[in-house]
Amino acid sequence: MIGTIAGVSGIAGAAVGAGACYLWLKNSTQKKFAHLEMEAKAKAKAISNEAELLLQESQMKIKTRELEHEAEFQKRLVQVEERNRALILEQKAVEKEEEALLLLEQRILEKESVLEALEEKKQKQISETVEKLQHAASMTQEEAKAYILEKVEEQSRAEIASIVRRYEQLAKEEGEKKANYILAQATTRYAGEFAGERLINLVNLPSDEHKGRIIGKEGRNIKALEMLLGVDIVIDETPGVILVSSFNLYRRAIATRVIEILIEDGRIHPGRIEEVHEKVEKEFEEKTYEEGENILIDLGLFPMHEELVKLIGRLKYRASYGQNALAHTLEVAKLARVMAAEMGGDEKLALRAGLLHDIGKALTQDMGGSHVEIGAELCRRYNEHPTVINAIYAHHGHEEPDSVESAAVCAADTLSAARPGARREVLESFTKRVKEIEEIATSKENVERAYAINAGREIRVFVNANRMSDNEAVLLSKEIAKEIKDKVQFPGEIKVNVIRETRAVSIAK
């Protein structure tokens, strides 16, 4: 019995020992795994830190190399520019030497020509003297007396003519000095600014998302904008802006304002575009009148007919040879006033004539024709002074100036236009070509309006749908294309797009 109890106790003790051993081993293993896990995390963190340091070092090296390359590039660029400047200076020096040699050669040739002429004259005089001596030997006393009187009379006439020519030359020199003095006074007392006109306007966008809204579904919105406004709208990868392009400054300014309002409003669809366009057109009509009125107030030229006031304001949206028409007009008016004052003329009348001398340009883009004839007709219609009308004709040589004020306007116009950099011939030739294309289209029957777009490579012609069929529209496009080909010189091709649109509107109540 005791042995049995002892056996059971031994087994129980062994079981307890085994359990304790198992628990110890388990705890030991967990601690070991925890320790290993901590070591692994520490190593991973160390590796990560080391990798980050290596990355930073690599980035620093790359940045250093980029800066070194940039510095080297700038250094080489400066060297190239210096070399170019040196070459330009050397070329200019060579050109000056060539000019000096040509001038010297010309002078030598002139002197040789003078010497030859003198030699011929001397030989002629010798021959004449010999003939006279031979003739005198056979003359009577009366014949000799008459001969001497005739020669004295000829010599006297020659001396009188010489005196007249000398005084004419003196008068001419004095006149030139006086004219130069007047021009110098005018240019000194008036210092105007000049900025060339561009062919594009930039419209800033709040975000690039608006580009998609302006384009619209399947390009619906941008097509409506271009067709209604008559401009090119360029949307590219440039962030935050779109371009509005047109040779017509007034049309381009209206288009820019329409797009700005649409972007601010957020509602962009064809119906809204038409509504905003009508509103902006009325706004610009009022704006041009206000601008013209402000100019007249500044110059003190009231009263003037309101139609002329509006056209003066509209000159702001017209350019000639890249020179803004309003800026040119104001410059001419102020220069003419100074010149008229120096010559004892009517300053106010010269100022008024200068302001109105190019008034016809405000309508030439819409009407076509000569701005001189249009301007003169407008001033006659609104009872302007005859001197103003004469100045309009005279500044392009259609008439001779009949007053000091007209002459001052002509001189001021030439001075303003002839300044270096004031005008750009290439831009004007392009603008003239585009205007010719539009005028050919608008001259056709049943054409309501026409817009040249894509730098003059396409023209959109809007016709009256009630008076023209689809077949007639096709024939019209071919007719316009043929006339453009015959009358306008242009590179490449021009697409003629005749648009016949019918709208039906009903109201549900």
UniProtKB/Swiss-Prot annotation:
<dbReference type="InterPro" id="IPR022711">
    <property type="entry name" value="RNase_Y_N"/>
</dbReference>
<feature type="domain" description="HD">
    <location>
        <begin position="325"/>
        <end position="418"/>
    </location>
</feature>
<dbReference type="GO" id="GO:0004521">
    <property type="term" value="F:RNA endonuclease activity"/>
</dbReference>
<feature type="transmembrane region" description="Helical">
    <location>
        <begin position="5"/>
        <end position="25"/>
    </location>
</feature>
<dbReference type="InterPro" id="IPR017705">
    <property type="entry name" value="Ribonuclease_Y"/>
</dbReference>
<protein>
    <recommendedName>
        <fullName>Ribonuclease Y</fullName>
        <ecNumber>3.1.-.-</ecNumber>
    </recommendedName>
</protein>
<feature type="domain" description="KH">
    <location>
        <begin position="199"/>
        <end position="265"/>
    </location>
</feature>
<dbReference type="InterPro" id="IPR006674">
    <property type="entry name" value="HD_domain"/>
</dbReference>
<dbReference type="Pfam" id="PF01966">
    <property type="entry name" value="HD"/>
</dbReference>
<keyword id="KW-0255">Endonuclease</keyword>
<dbReference type="InterPro" id="IPR006675">
    <property type="entry name" value="HDIG_dom"/>
</dbReference>
<dbReference type="Pfam" id="PF12072">
    <property type="entry name" value="RNase_Y_N"/>
</dbReference>
<dbReference type="GO" id="GO:0005886">
    <property type="term" value="C:plasma membrane"/>
</dbReference>
<dbReference type="GO" id="GO:0003723">
    <property type="term" value="F:RNA binding"/>
</dbReference>
<comment type="similarity">
    <text>Belongs to the RNase Y family.</text>
</comment>
<dbReference type="Pfam" id="PF00013">
    <property type="entry name" value="KH_1"/>
</dbReference>
<keyword id="KW-0472">Membrane</keyword>
<keyword id="KW-1003">Cell membrane</keyword>
<keyword id="KW-0812">Transmembrane</keyword>
<keyword id="KW-0378">Hydrolase</keyword>
<dbReference type="GO" id="GO:0006402">
    <property type="term" value="P:mRNA catabolic process"/>
</dbReference>
<dbReference type="InterPro" id="IPR004087">
    <property type="entry name" value="KH_dom"/>
</dbReference>
<dbReference type="InterPro" id="IPR004088">
    <property type="entry name" value="KH_dom_type_1"/>
</dbReference>
<dbReference type="InterPro" id="IPR003607">
    <property type="entry name" value="HD/PDEase_dom"/>
</dbReference>
<keyword id="KW-1133">Transmembrane helix</keyword>
<keyword id="KW-0694">RNA-binding</keyword>
<dbReference type="InterPro" id="IPR036612">
    <property type="entry name" value="KH_dom_type_1_sf"/>
</dbReference>
<comment type="function">
    <text>Endoribonuclease that initiates mRNA decay.</text>
</comment>
<keyword id="KW-0540">Nuclease</keyword>
